[in-house]
Amino acid sequence: MSAIRYELIKTDKQTGARLGKIHTPHGTFDTPMFMPVGTLATVKTMSPEELKAMGAGIILSNTYHLWLRPGEELIREAGGLHKFMNWDQPILTDSGGFQVFSLSKMRDIKEEGVHFRNHLNGDKLFLSPEKAIQIQNALGSDIMMSFDECPPYPASHEYMKKSVERTSRWAERGLKAHVRPEDQGLFGIVQGGAYEDLRAQSAKDLVSLDFPGYSIGGLSVGEPKDVMNRVLEHTTPLLPANKPRYLMGVGSPDSLIDGVIRGVDMFDCVLPTRIARNGTCMTSSGRLVIKNAKFTHDFRPIDENCDCYTCKNYSRAYIRHLIRCEETFGIRLTTYHNLHFLLNLMKQVRGAIMEDRLADFREEFFEQYGFNRPDAKNF
């Protein structure tokens, strides 16, 4: 019996987008869903109660960072990640692969795994497919990721082909190392860059291993948005319709909607929390940089169409003052707003699928947000 189960509720007649639920050992969440990122077992400045109140059905934590600090054995001793951070709903952990390839300047990729330097202190470390699974088994997340190679964009077809083949072999090794399949669902990660033939090969390899869910990796790494959309259009039909599909590292409003239209169920990204710390806010009419001087005497909320805690209680002028003074409360307010904005957007997307009007919703949202303008400002 798999630890997780995908339930398809409805398909949008306009686009083919999926409305569903994912059942896990720690509860069920609606899809499509955006997952806030809690890198070190916390979503920066947010409490679990606040995240639940705004509709976060699942959050993500980073295996690499938790392995380094505080260590997976301490978290196992605490009773697992859920008890350690007092979060009783689903948790997804990544494999650590992305961090190994993005944070470490010194790395050596071998068949057995990756030798690299700790980005904090320079110590030599080694991460293999088996080790990545062992760490996640200790963390006790509901959904785990296979260890994959994350090639840069762009990369040659020759390099990408070898990388895809290695990732497929690593996925099989990780599956064999997984000792808690009844408690934790392990996803395979489809790679292949912008090459459709390699995406097809990667998907075929992973589907043959019968994972309970599939991730699409190697996108949102610098490629143009039309390339990402083309890759998704080619890749999602190759994945089983009765299992969840997760697009990794995507969190801008337009990419979330376009990903859903192309059959994706789950998304994560640090974008809403990272830009919030610099005072950049997502609003129903586009990007708003709260530090700008024009908001000095602006006593309206960040977004007059938003009913989040921040917008119901505080003005642009006040939040601008806090952010400019580097007050933590200002970061809390912008973080709360951005997460609420994306989670509410996904709620609206689910409603549009239920009403078979997702294409219409996209058109309306893009027009209001300003994505259709020649000078459109994205994130």
Swiss-Prot record:
Q: Does the keyword Metal-binding apply?
A: yes
Under Gene3D superfamilies, the record lists:
Queuine tRNA-ribosyltransferase-like
The record's top EC class is transferase
Q: Which InterPro entries match?
A: ArchSynthase1/Queuine_TRR, TGT, TGT-like_sf, tRNA_ribo_trans-like
Keywords for the protein's UniProt record, in alphabetical order: Glycosyltransferase, Metal-binding, Queuosine biosynthesis, Transferase, tRNA processing, Zinc
Binding sites annotated in the UniProt record for substrate:
D94, S95, G96, G97, F98, D148, Q191, G218
Q: Where is this region: RNA binding?
A: 249-255, 273-277
* One Gene Ontology term, aspect cellular component: cytosol
Which SUPFAM superfamilies is this protein grouped with? tRNA-guanine transglycosylase (SSF51713)
Q: Which Pfam families match?
A: TGT
Q: Could you say which cofactors this protein requires?
A: Zn(2+)
**One BP term from GO:** queuosine biosynthetic process
Family per similarity comment: Belongs to the queuine tRNA-ribosyltransferase family.
Q: What is this protein called?
A: Queuine tRNA-ribosyltransferase
The organism encoding this protein is: Listeria monocytogenes serotype 4b (strain CLIP80459)
